[in-house]
Structure formats: structure tokens, C-alpha cells
């Protein structure tokens, strides 16, 4: 039996099938861990979601920011749904939309297998969160998503504020937890998320750190596998294994085997992307580079503007939605 973690699919159905063939996935004995962002931008989001749903007995899924945005869109009126991008619109108007969205809503923000020694999240963790604390906070939001009041949560999850504090309550608390699990890249030593910095380490504003390199962070008792940050490429450092390699942006789709002592990485090329012509930019003053140790593989292509494959959200959500 093999256990494979797979990076952000983002609606790249054909490429997902190619990766499953390459790792020789056998549903009779293998298990897949999907790191979130199953949908959006790849053009085959409905097919991708149906595929992962069909594998639900043989897989584990954590929710990404794009998945939460899809759930929020699904909870709106049909008139509003017809204004979103075609890739997501096909899902919310499909005949089996209720089956797919009800199943997606039951998925996790964090998955832990202590026997295997791994935790899976989509984006990041607060610097002071142990894995036990992360599980507890994930369950708080999961219970709301899976309960009868989930529509109110989906309407109130948008926005950058407040930053995490143990004393938060209500939707402020839920929003802060969601932002950490699904939107985090850089933060301050106090755990304040910087949502505007999305590029590779060394390009961020002074005083910000990759969430897994923040000074004073707690030591964690599990290895972590995550996605979300395609600008990193394949990055293995500080017990964190970041495997979003930008398949939707022309990078690669990555699988990491979790049940072996020796790391095994399998990749397939991402979708073909034609880069738009861009006007020359004025040189930018280099920012202070934060020192780091990491193992890199093929870098996810990003979207050409240094934000690691996180272009402006589709016209579906108010404010700075979790679609980034």
C-alpha cells in the first residue's frame, strides 16, 4: 500500500489523470492525500471535482481557498452564480452540484495521521500552534461548515482581519483560522499574515518570514505537507514539504510518497500556458533576503507577476476573498 500526497490540482483534470497513471495508483490498496485547491482556473474543474469525489473512499482532502470560494458561490443565488468565471460556473450549475458541494463541505482544514507521522494542510500554521492546537482549531471551523449555519460562515469568511488571537470569538475567530489554514505564506514573528506578499522568499517586505521559518516558532512533532504557494516550487525545509508546483500555471503537478523513509517525488508537466505580452517594468530595488535552507525541484511557473500563481480572484466574491 502506498500513500501519496498531491499538490494543487486547480481544475487540471487531464494532468491529474496523467499523474495517477505515473504513480500507478491502485484504488484497491493505495491512498491519496489532496492538499486542497481542487478547482479553479484549469478549465476542467467540474471533471476534476467529479474525479476526486469518485475516489472519496480512497483519499483524504483538505480545503483550500479556491474550494472555500466555490462553496461560497454555491450558496448564492443562481443570478449571482452566472456572473462567476465559466470554470466554476459549470460546477454550480451542474446536475450533480448538490452531491459534489455537499461532499466538499464535509472535508477538512487539517488532516493528521500520527501513525504515519504526517499532517496535511493547504497553506500554513500560526507560529505558536502545535499540531494538537492546529487540529483543535481546524475542527472548530469544520463543525461550522458541516452544520446548518454554514451559509452564514461562508458569507462572513472574507477579509484579511483580524489577525489570530486566542481570545477571538464568533466569525472573527473563524475568519482568522481560515486565513491561516488556506491563505498564509508570509507572516510576522507575532503571526500577522501578509496577504500582499506572494512571491519567492527574498522578495518579501522586511520583517516578514515564510510561515515555516518564523523566529520563535514552536517545534512540531509531525512532518507537514502543504500546497498553496506555487512560487516556492518543490520546497522541503524545516519539516515542511510544500508541493504546489504550479501545474495550472505551466509548472508541474507533484506527488510525494508519504509512507517511505526515503523521499520519493513524482511529477508530470502542467498545462500549457501562453504567456501574455507584458510591458517592460522599471527595476525594483532588491529587498533584504531572509536566509533559508531548502531542497528545490521544478518551480511552479506562477503567473508572470511574481505572485506565485495567485492572480486576481474571479468576480465572484466580495473583497479579498479566499480565492487568491
From Swiss-Prot:
Name of the molecule in the record: Bis(5'-nucleosyl)-tetraphosphatase, symmetrical
Compositional bias (Gly residues): 298-309
HAMAP family reported in the protein's UniProt record: ApaH (MF_00199)
One term of GO molecular function: bis(5'-nucleosyl)-tetraphosphatase (symmetrical) activity
Feature: compositional bias, Basic residues: 282-297
Keywords: Hydrolase
GO cellular component: cytoplasm
Region named Disordered: 269-324
Enzyme class: hydrolase
Gene3D superfamilies: 3.60.21.10
Family statement: Belongs to the Ap4A hydrolase family.
Family annotation (InterPro entries): ApaH (IPR004617), Calcineurin-like_PHP_ApaH (IPR004843), Metallo-depent_PP-like (IPR029052)
Enzyme Commission identifier(s): 3.6.1.41
Function as written in the Swiss-Prot or TrEMBL entry: Hydrolyzes diadenosine 5',5'''-P1,P4-tetraphosphate to yield ADP.
The organism's place on the tree of life at top rank: Bacteria
Catalysed transformations (reactions): P(1),P(4)-bis(5'-adenosyl) tetraphosphate + H2O = 2 ADP + 2 H(+)
GO biological process: RNA decapping
A Pfam family: Metallophos
Low complexity biased stretches: 310-324
